[in-house]
Amino acid sequence: MVAPSVRVPDTLGQTLHQLALANGLANRGLDVTLLCRYDSKNANTQNLNPELKFLSIVNPGIPFERIIFTRQSYRKVLSELGSKKYDIVHDRGYIFAGSGVKAASEMGVKSILQVDDNWMRSELSATKVARLWPYNQKAIRSCRDQIEKADGGFTVSTILRDQISKWNPKANNFAVIQNGYEDNLFIPEAKPLGIREKLNLKGDIAVFVGALGPWHGTDELVEIAKRNPDLNVIVAGGGYGHNLPKLSNLYHIGRLERSEVPALLVESDIGLAPYPNVDYGFSPLKIYEYMGCKLPVIATSLPSVKEATQGHALLVPSGQMASAVPKVLSNKKLLSELSESAYSYASSRRTWENTIDKTIDLYKKTI
């Protein structure tokens, strides 16, 4: 499994996703080697399958590091395929990547390409350079070539598959495999974190868990707090240098340990999932985790979010969450129905076990 953009340890969704996928496959008896930016000194592998192997590449931590770790990844994959027998290469793609599918095609090994978001849209939100014509054209060519070299692949939403098929129509044949959540960790019975006592909170709690990146509607979180002064808005996460303003009811508690996240969720009254009015094609981990803790969810109404939630969350247009939240919180019957519906849906349809089943099926079809 080739995932050079992934750092271990880290709290970003891509790390949580890839570790859960690799570990789940190892638990099913597959011999899995995960190539990533692995820090053996700081990584906690206590809860991972002991048979899951890691292949570490450099983690430069400098501008344009992607060029460096992608090139090293390609060399390492070639070396691995030349010295050991692998049945399939599973490559987590990104802009200017494809080290796994490229090496596999050169060594005569079958490969699949994993696409988790619209790389071009993510790139445009992260850097203005992506708007420049030469850069933009080279980026699109990278997307097209990765799809072309792969023997198969999957996206995490139907919307995303439609989007990337514009880069290369071959992607129309990709499978759709939604993300899952850890149903042994995110449970309604989790012991509360005690955040009410720690922060001396009165009234309802609205919670957001995740990185404060451009793909999340961070400004909308601020607006929710401003327009609802009696509501406690808790933001757990960090990254990307986004400093939230100081408001008396807005609490940015930073990153939590993984085990602390469900403890926070079960103490909250509603889970927030705001997004800008741009559909990246995500399969939102946070929403499934909210649901697993029986937390009612209010999210931005985007095609990919509709597909992910299937009517089990309250969806509102981008920018309108601040006015919708108090209406939902005041309707206890609706809150109860949302929490029960969300939990039933997530626990039966959105666990990692379901994701692993579909991934193994794709491997079998590709090999």
Predicted regions located by residue number:
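Carbohydrate-associated surface elements
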Residues: 159, 180
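Conserved acidic donor-binding segment of nucleotide-sugar-dependent glycosyltransferases
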Residues: 311-320, 327-333
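A charged, aromatic-enriched C-terminal amphipathic alpha-helix characteristic of glycosyltransferases
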Residues: 333-364
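Nucleotide-sugar-dependent
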Residues: 216, 257-264, 269-291, 299-311
